[in-house]
């Protein structure tokens, strides 16, 4: 039997999972690390914390599985996307804490770029919008704010990497400075049509080319780990950003297949095949994966509040003590009430992209109580997913010819109530997989594919296992009434926006 180690480096913790060659899990290790908030809207990580927690969990998972380095056929890496690290090419010392994807410190830089009219060019080349979320403006901030950084970068003394790239550099003992196309596509510097770093974008954002890593396929030879780390060298054969890795772990290899991951927020990706689809509905166009030099593209939409709406019920209102209570409580709601929660606690994500809005409840009556609030909170996740679903169908020209298949993962999918309501509102089946560790599985698959122990994508897809399919059971009239009410609630909230 062969084994693959998947490194899943997330925003709040690092995880390592050992998969057997039959895709079953042999061991899991997890370690949380500190978050740093030095100013309002700023979020940072210590690069050494990212590295030490990754190394510790990798060692623990291998030991827990009763294995040694020579038993591991390959390592796959998946990571929090867009987070930026700059480090010294010789010493490996980071010049600053990592700036995390959630960080908003470059808002003014982004506003200036927009006001100067650069967004159409950036969107055309990268598929992204100008937003502090992405890596490019974070790199510029570090070069300009850390004393001497820009001069050092111009002299070729510094390296940039997203978290995957930084971990790869550390794992290989500083021998390999590389990333994959999915991570590169989130930087604002990578042309998703040519598959290259773009000179015009580098000049626009004032980023020296010498900082940037080599861009490889998602399943490729990324070198080997330093033999001193695990008691022997292990080949590193796969890399993908976390949402793309989940898309792969869900075996969404065919155009029209969509995965939606429900955690604190929600990220949905729709495979659109070999041609990038331009969005007219404020979705992102991104690279789903790159295999054998061939890029597969996706439309991506993000929802800021999904599971955090349930956390609000628990921590903010105190009407539940555990997330699992939400569905049964929602079941007790008064069916004659139409309460809508628009959970814009930190603004609305796709397809609205309005950071200024704040949450609101609509349809309250004297009889509205905890059950109705639980009902509204869970339904809000389904309504927001419907908005993404509708935007993707509108953007993708083949939507009428192909049935979109939705596969879900993440902690919130444990709620049967929510998944059934999602199927009802979409009027489409919702598939929950047997293996919930889809992000790590995607990284493991990419590594195992390159190492020759996992099959080609189609065969892997054939082996994908369904745990439960939720089928729509709501009447068309009820669905239409509910969606009309949601649209009215969103319009009502949008009307409160007075601009910046």
Swiss-Prot record:
GO molecular function: ATP binding; glycerol kinase activity
GO cellular component terms attached to this protein's record: cytosol
Key words, A-Z: ATP-binding, Glycerol metabolism, Kinase, Nucleotide-binding, Transferase
Activity regulation behaviour: Inhibited by fructose 1,6-bisphosphate (FBP).
Any Pfam family hit: FGGY_N
Catalytic activity: glycerol + ATP = sn-glycerol 3-phosphate + ADP + H(+)
Binding, glycerol: 81-82, 133, 242-243
Residues annotated as binding sn-glycerol 3-phosphate: 11, 81-82, 133, 242
Disulfide bond recorded as keyword: no
Protein name: Glycerol kinase
Organism of derivation: Rhodopseudomonas palustris (strain BisA53)
């Amino acid at each position: 039997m062969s084994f693959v180690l998947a490194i899943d480096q997330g925003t709040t913790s690092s995880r390592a999972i050992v998969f057997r060659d039959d895709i079953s899990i042999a061991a899991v290790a997890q370690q949380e690390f500190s978050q740093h908030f030095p100013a309002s809207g700023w979020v940072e990580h210590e690069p050494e914390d990212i590295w030490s927690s990754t190394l510790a969990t990798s060692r623990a998972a291998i030991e827990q599985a009763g294995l040694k380095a020579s038993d591991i056929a390959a390592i796959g890496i998946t990571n929090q996307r867009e987070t930026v690290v700059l480090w010294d090419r010789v010493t490996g010392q980071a010049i600053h804490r990592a700036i995390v994807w959630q960080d908003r410190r470059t808002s003014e830089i982004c506003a200036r770029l927009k006001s100067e009219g650069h967004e159409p060019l950036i969107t055309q080349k990268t598929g992204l919008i100008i937003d502090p979320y992405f890596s490019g403006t974070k790199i510029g901030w570090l070069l300009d704010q850390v004393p001497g950084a820009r001069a050092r970068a111009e002299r070729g003394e510094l390296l940039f990497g997203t978290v995957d790239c930084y971990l790869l550099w550390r794992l290989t003992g500083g021998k390999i400075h590389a990333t994959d196309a999915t991570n590169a596509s989130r930087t604002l510097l990578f042309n998703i049509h040519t598959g290259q770093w773009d000179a015009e974008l580098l000049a626009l954002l004032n980023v020296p080319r010498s900082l940037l890593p080599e861009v490889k396929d998602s399943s490729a030879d990324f070198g080997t780990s330093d033999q001193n780390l695990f008691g022997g060298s292990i080949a590193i054969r796969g890399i993908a950003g976390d949402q793309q890795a989940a898309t792969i772990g869900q075996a969404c290899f065919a155009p029209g297949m969509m995965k939606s991951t429900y955690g604190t927020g929600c990220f949905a990706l729709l495979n659109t095949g070999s041609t990038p689809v331009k969005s007219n509905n404020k979705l992102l166009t991104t690279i789903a994966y790159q295999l054998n030099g061939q890029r597969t593209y996706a439309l991506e939409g993000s929802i800021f509040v999904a599971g955090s709406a349930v956390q609000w019920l628990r921590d903010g209102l105190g009407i539940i003590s555990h997330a699992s209570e939400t569905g049964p409580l929602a079941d007790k709601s008064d069916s004659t009430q139409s309460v809508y929660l628009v959970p814009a606690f930190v603004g609305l994500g796709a397809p609205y992209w309005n950071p200024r809005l704040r949450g609101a409840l609509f349809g309250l009556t004297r009889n509205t109580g905890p059950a109705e609030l639980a009902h509204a909170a869970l339904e809000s996740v389904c309504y927001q997913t419907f908005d993404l679903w509708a935007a993707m169908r509108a953007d993708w020209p083949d939507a009428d010819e192909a049935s979109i298949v939705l596969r879900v993962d993440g902690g919130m999918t444990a709620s049967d109530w929510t998944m059934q309501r999602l199927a009802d509102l979409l009027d489409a089946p919702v598939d929950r997989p047997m293996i919930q560790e889809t992000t790590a599985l995607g990284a493991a698959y990419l590594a195992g594919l390159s190492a020759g122990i996992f099959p080609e994508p189609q065969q892997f897809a054939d082996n994908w296992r369904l745990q439960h399919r939720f089928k729509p059971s709501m009447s068309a009239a009820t669905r239409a009434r509910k969606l009309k009410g949601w649209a009215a609630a969103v319009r009502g909230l949008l009307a409160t926006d007075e601009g910046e």
